[in-house]
Amino acid sequence: MELKVTTLEGKEAGSVQLSDAIFGLEPRQDIIARCVQWQLNKRQAGTHKAKGRAEIWRTGKKMYKQKGTGGARHGSARVPQFRGGGRAFGPVVRSHATDLPKKVRALALKHALSAKAKDGDLLVIDKAALEAAKTKALLGHFSGLGLTNALIIDGAELNNGFAAAARNIPNMDVLPIQGINVYDILRRQKLVLTKAAIDALEARFK
């Protein structure tokens, strides 16, 4: 697969050959969905907590005598059916993370990249760099490229000026190649890769 390479200014900068093993697969929604669910499960805090009957601070004395009241038999005021009692099967602090094999994660990333390429939502630029961290200037570049909602992936190290200028632009994310992931690819309309990012991806999946 061959794609044109453009500069931030919108000028042509040659072309790049993309590997069909990474960008030319037929996207499988089930694999992508498994990876997205794995990511969302992993990032849940799991800090929710409700007290059970054993954790409630309340007297352990029997509420009232066993017989003669006409009421139901009760031994403890800490049980869930009473106001102020413990919660039955309440949430506890736990990890929501699930397991997903590394090979499935790698395959899901390939399918997410292939989905963007197939839909025409993949753009390749020569480099993501600015001399001065000016948000207004970067907005002009994005407007010229038709980008309003995009994920930009650069090489191993981000250009400080570019990253600082993009930080305050809504719906635009900038990540180094180490941070590329299925969820962030799918949550943005366009995927922008630099030539350095493509080289790193092909080396990773070699």
Curated annotation (Swiss-Prot):
Under InterPro entries, the record lists: Ribosomal_uL4, Ribosomal_uL4-like, Ribosomal_uL4_dom_sf
The record's similarity note reads: Belongs to the universal ribosomal protein uL4 family.
Q: Is ATP-binding among the key words of this record? A: no
Domain of life of the organism encoding this protein: Bacteria
- Assembly, per entry: Part of the 50S ribosomal subunit.
Q: Which UniProt keywords apply?
A: Ribonucleoprotein, Ribosomal protein, RNA-binding, rRNA-binding
Q: What does this chain do?
A: One of the primary rRNA binding proteins, this protein initially binds near the 5'-end of the 23S rRNA. It is important during the early stages of 50S assembly. It makes multiple contacts with different domains of the 23S rRNA in the assembled 50S subunit and ribosome. Forms part of the polypeptide exit tunnel.
Q: Which gene encodes it?
A: rplD
UniProt protein name: Large ribosomal subunit protein uL4
Q: Which organism is it from?
A: Bradyrhizobium diazoefficiens (strain JCM 10833 / BCRC 13528 / IAM 13628 / NBRC 14792 / USDA 110)
Gene Ontology MF terms in the entry: rRNA binding; structural constituent of ribosome
Q: Tell me the GO BP annotations in alphabetical order.
A: translation
Cellular component (GO) terms are: ribonucleoprotein complex; ribosome
